[in-house]
C-alpha cells in the first residue's frame, strides 16, 4: 500500500476547493495560511505552539487582517475589470454592513484599508449607527442607514449629514418617510433618501425568504407610488437619491441574482421616467461564500459563481437598461459583508478525549456457561461474511433487542448485557467494512458509518463560537491542523464541552455531498491534537451566546510580510468573573460569601485552616481564569 501523501489530505478535506488561495498544507503536514501573495505562509501548528509559550491557550480565534485587505482589493479589482469591459460610466461603492462582524478591530481594519476604494459602512440599528458615525471614514465614503428608525435615529443621521457625512436614510416602511420629512424640515437639512423596494424576485439557499413577497422589509409597488406622491407633494423629489433591494444572504444561484437585477433595473428606469433622478442603486448583499468548495448551486453552503461573475452581471444589467432608455448609469452600491470577512478568521481548539463504541476482543472466547443469546451472537460474528451479512445484520438486531428487553425485566445480568453490546458493535463494524467495498450495498447499511463514528470531545462551545452550525446547520470547513502527512485512522463527530446534547458538529464537508463524520487521527499520549474551523469571520463572533457561561475565546491578530509573521495583538478571552457579572453575580460578593462559609466550616471542624485557605485560593484563581478548560 502506498504511503499517505499531503495531496491525499488536500483532497480528503477539499482544502483547495474552499481554501481558495489562502489555505493549504505544507511539507510538515501542517495547515498553512497565506494571507498575501507577497507574504509568507503562516504554519498554524507552529503559531499555536508559540502562543502556548505566551500563555495564550486554546480555544482561540486567529484573525488575519491581511486577508480582509485582500478581499477588499479583490472586490474592487473585479469592479474595475467589469467597468472597463461594459463601458460603465458611474462609480461603484463597496459598503460593509457592520452587523456581519461589529468587532472594533475588524471594522477599523476594513475602513483603514478601504479608504482608497471609497469603502463605506452600513448601520441596521440605532446602536450600530452610533458606532458607524464615530468611525473615521473617508469624506467621500457612504453611510447607509437601514433597519427600523425612530425620531432619535433619524435626528442623529440628519445632524451627522449636516456636519458633512454622506448619509443615506433608506426607507423600510412608509411611516419612516413621513418621519424623515418632518425631522428634516425641523433641522433645516435636505435629506438623502433611499427607498427599499420589495422585489418579487428572491434569492436561493437558507435565506431565500429574505427576499420576494414574504420579505420582512421594503415597499411594494403600490406603497412605492404612495411614497413618490408624498415626496412630490412635499417638494422633495430631489431628495430621493437611492433605491435599494436585498434578496437574501448567501445566494447560491447566480440565475436568481440576474433575475433580481433585471427587475430592479426597471424600477430605476421607471423612476427616471417619472422625473425622479435617482443616482444610486444599492443591490444589497447576497454575494455568497463557497464554504464547502464544491462551487455548486445545489448546496446551501456553496455558490455556483465567482465574485467577478457577480460583479459582471450587476454592472452589465444596469448599464444595458440605462443605455436602452437613454438615462445615466447609476452608481452601484454593494453590501457584501460575508464575502469580505468570512475568510479572515480561524477558530482553533484542542481535542480533550475520545469515546468509542465497545468492541469484542478478537482473542476473547465466550465461557461455556455464557447466556444462550451471547453464544448465538458470537456465532454470527464468528461466521460473518459477505454472502450472509444482511441476514446476520437482521439476526444481530433481533438478539440485541431481545437482550435489552430481558435486562429491563431483570432476567439477564449486567455482564451479559455488556457482552451483547460488544459483540453487536463488532458485527456492525465488520458489516460496515464489507458494505463499504461493495458497489451496490443494501440501503439498510447506509447509516452505519454515522452510527459507528467516534466522539471527539473538544475544548470549545458551539453556541459561543459557531452559533450558525447549531441554529441553521451551516457547514464550515473543519480539519486537523497537524499530522496531515498521516492517513486518518478514525472517523468522528465533534462534541463541545457544554452540558447540552445539541453541542456537537455532525455535518462535514465531503467530496460527495455532506458527511456525518470527519476523518481524524487517533490521539497520541502527551501530544495535543488541534482542530480548526475555517471561514468563521462572518456573523459567528457577534451571534455567539454564553450557554453554560462559556465566554469569548482568546483572540489573536496575525499580520504577515515577505520575511515572516507578526503577532500584532492578543485579546484575552473572558474570565469566569466577567461572564458571571453579565448575569448579575458580583464576583466580590461571591468571594465574601465563600469566605464566611469557609470560616464557619473551619470553626465547626469540618475542614482544617489549611484546607480552607486552599479552597479559597482555588476559588479566587478560578474566578479570574479562563472560562474554558485549561
From Swiss-Prot:
Q: Which organism is it from?
A: Bacteroides fragilis (strain ATCC 25285 / DSM 2151 / CCUG 4856 / JCM 11019 / LMG 10263 / NCTC 9343 / Onslow / VPI 2553 / EN-2)
Q: Outline what the protein does.
A: Catalyzes the biosynthesis of agmatine from arginine.
Q: Which residues carry this modification: N6-(pyridoxal phosphate)lysine?
A: 99
Q: Which BP terms from GO are recorded?
A: arginine catabolic process; spermidine biosynthetic process
Supply the gene name. speA
Catalyzed reactions per annotation: L-arginine + H(+) = agmatine + CO2
Entry binding sites for substrate: 281-291
Concerning its family, UniProt says:
Belongs to the Orn/Lys/Arg decarboxylase class-II family. SpeA subfamily.
InterPro entries, per database record: Ala_racemase/Decarboxylase_C, Arg_decarb_HB, Arg_decarbox_C, Arg_decrbxlase, De-COase2_CS, De-COase2_N, De-COase2_pyr-phos_BS, Orn/DAP/Arg_de-COase
Which pathway, per its entry?
Amine and polyamine biosynthesis; agmatine biosynthesis; agmatine from L-arginine: step 1/1
Might you give the EC number(s) for this enzyme?
4.1.1.19
Pfam families per UniProt: Arg_decarb_HB, Arg_decarbox_C, Orn_Arg_deC_N
Query: What keywords would UniProt list here?
Result: Decarboxylase, Lyase, Magnesium, Metal-binding, Polyamine biosynthesis, Pyridoxal phosphate, Spermidine biosynthesis
What the entry lists under PANTHER family is as follows: ARGININE DECARBOXYLASE, BIOSYNTHETIC ARGININE DECARBOXYLASE
Q: Which cofactor does it need?
A: Mg(2+); pyridoxal 5'-phosphate
Designated name of the protein: Biosynthetic arginine decarboxylase
Q: Name one GO molecular function term.
A: metal ion binding
Amino acid at each position: 500500500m502506498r504511503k499517505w501523501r499531503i495531496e491525499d489530505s488536500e483532497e480528503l478535506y477539499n482544502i483547495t476547493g474552499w481554501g481558495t488561495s489562502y489555505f493549504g498544507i505544507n511539507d510538515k503536514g501542517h495547515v498553512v495560511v497565506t494571507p498575501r501573495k507577497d507574504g509568507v505562509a503562516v504554519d498554524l501548528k507552529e503559531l499555536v505552539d508559540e502562543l502556548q509559550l505566551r500563555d495564550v491557550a486554546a480555544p482561540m480565534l486567529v484573525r488575519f487582517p491581511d486577508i480582509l485587505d485582500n478581499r477588499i482589493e479583490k472586490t474592487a479589482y473585479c469592479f474595475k475589470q467589469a467597468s472597463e469591459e461594459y463601458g460603465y460610466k458611474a462609480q461603484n461603492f463597496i459598503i460593509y454592513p457592520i452587523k456581519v462582524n461589529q468587532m472594533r478591530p475588524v471594522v477599523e481594519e476594513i475602513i483603514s484599508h478601504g479608504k482608497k476604494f471609497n469603502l463605506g459602512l452600513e448601520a441596521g440599528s440605532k446602536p450600530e449607527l452610533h458606532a458607524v458615525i464615530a468611525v473615521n471614514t473617508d469624506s467621500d465614503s457612504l453611510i447607509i442607514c437601514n433597519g427600523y428608525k425612530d425620531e432619535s435615529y433619524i435626528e442623529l443621521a440628519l445632524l451627522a449629514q449636516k456636519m458633512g457625512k454622506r448619509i443615506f436614510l433608506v426607507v423600510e416602511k412608509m411611516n419612516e418617510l413621513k418621519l424623515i420629512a418632518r425631522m428634516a424640515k425641523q433641522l433645516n437639512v435636505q435629506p438623502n433618501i433611499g427607498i427599499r423596494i420589495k422585489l418579487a424576485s428572491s434569492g436561493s439557499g437558507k435565506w431565500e425568504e429574505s427576499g420576494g413577497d414574504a420579505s420582512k422589509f421594503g415597499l411594494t409597488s403600490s406603497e412605492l407610488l404612495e411614497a413618490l406622491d408624498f415626496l412630490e407633494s412635499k417638494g422633495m423629489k430631489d431628495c430621493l437619491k437611492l433605491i435599494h433591494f436585498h434578496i437574501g444572504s448567501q445566494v447560491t444561484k447566480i440565475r436568481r441574482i440576474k433575475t433580481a437585477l433585471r427587475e430592479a433595473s426597471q424600477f430605476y428606469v421607471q423612476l427616471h421616467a417619472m422625473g425622479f433622478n435617482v443616482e444610486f442603486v444599492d443591490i444589497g448583499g447576497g454575494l455568497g461564500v463557497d464554504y464547502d468548495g464544491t462551487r455548486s448551486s445545489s448546496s446551501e453552503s456553496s455558490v455556483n459563481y465567482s465574485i467577478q461573475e457577480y460583479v459582471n452581471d450587476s454592472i452589465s444589467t444596469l448599464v444595458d437598461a440605462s443605455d436602452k432608455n437613454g438615462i445615466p448609469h447609476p452608481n452601484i452600491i454593494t453590501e457584501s459583508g460575508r464575502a469580505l470577512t468570512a475568510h479572515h478568521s480561524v477558530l482553533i481548539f484542542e481535542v480533550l478525549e475520545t469515546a468509542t463504541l465497545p468492541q469484542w476482543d478478537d482473542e476473547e472466547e465466550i465461557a461455556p456457561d455464557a447466556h444462550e443469546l451471547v453464544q448465538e451472537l458470537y456465532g454470527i460474528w464468528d461466521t460473518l461474511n459477505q454472502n450472509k451479512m444482511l441476514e446476520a445484520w437482521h439476526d444481530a438486531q433481533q438478539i440485541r433487542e431481545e437482550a435489552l428487553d430481558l435486562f429491563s425485566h431483570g432476567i439477564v445480568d449486567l455482564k451479559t448485557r455488556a457482552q451483547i453490546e460488544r459483540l453487536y458493535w463488532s458485527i456492525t463494524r465488520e458489516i460496515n467494512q464489507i458494505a463499504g467495498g461493495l458497489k451496490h450495498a443494501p440501503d439498510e447499511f447506509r447509516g452505519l458509518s454515522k452510527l459507528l463514528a467516534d466522539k471527539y470531545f473538544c475544548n470549545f462551545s458551539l453556541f459561543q463560537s459557531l452559533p450558525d452550525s447549531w441554529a441553521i446547520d451551516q457547514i464550515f470547513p473543519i480539519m486537523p491542523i497537524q499530522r496531515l502527512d498521516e492517513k486518518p485512522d478514525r472517523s468522528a463527530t465533534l462534541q463541545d464541552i457544554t452540558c447540552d446534547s445539541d453541542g456537537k458538529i455532525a455535518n462535514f464537508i465531503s467530496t460527495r455531498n455532506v458527511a456525518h463524520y470527519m476523518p481524524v487521527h487517533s490521539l497520541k499520549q502527551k501530544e495535543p491534537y488541534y482542530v480548526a474551523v475555517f471561514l468563521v469571520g462572518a456573523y459567528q463572533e457577534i451571534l455567539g451566546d454564553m450557554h453554560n457561561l462559556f465566554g469569548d475565546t482568546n483572540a489573536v491578530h496575525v499580520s504577515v510580510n515577505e520575511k515572516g509573521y507578526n503577532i500584532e495583538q492578543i485579546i484575552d478571552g473572558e474570565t469566569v468573573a466577567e461572564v458571571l457579572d453579565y448575569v448579575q453575580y458580583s464576583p466580590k460578593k461571591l468571594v465574601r460569601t465563600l469566605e464566611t462559609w469557609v470560616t464557619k466550616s473551619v470553626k465547626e471542624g469540618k475542614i482544617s485552616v489549611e484546607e480552607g485557605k486552599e479552597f479559597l485560593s482555588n476559588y479566587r484563581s478560578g474566578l479570574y481564569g479562563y472560562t474554558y478548560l485549561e
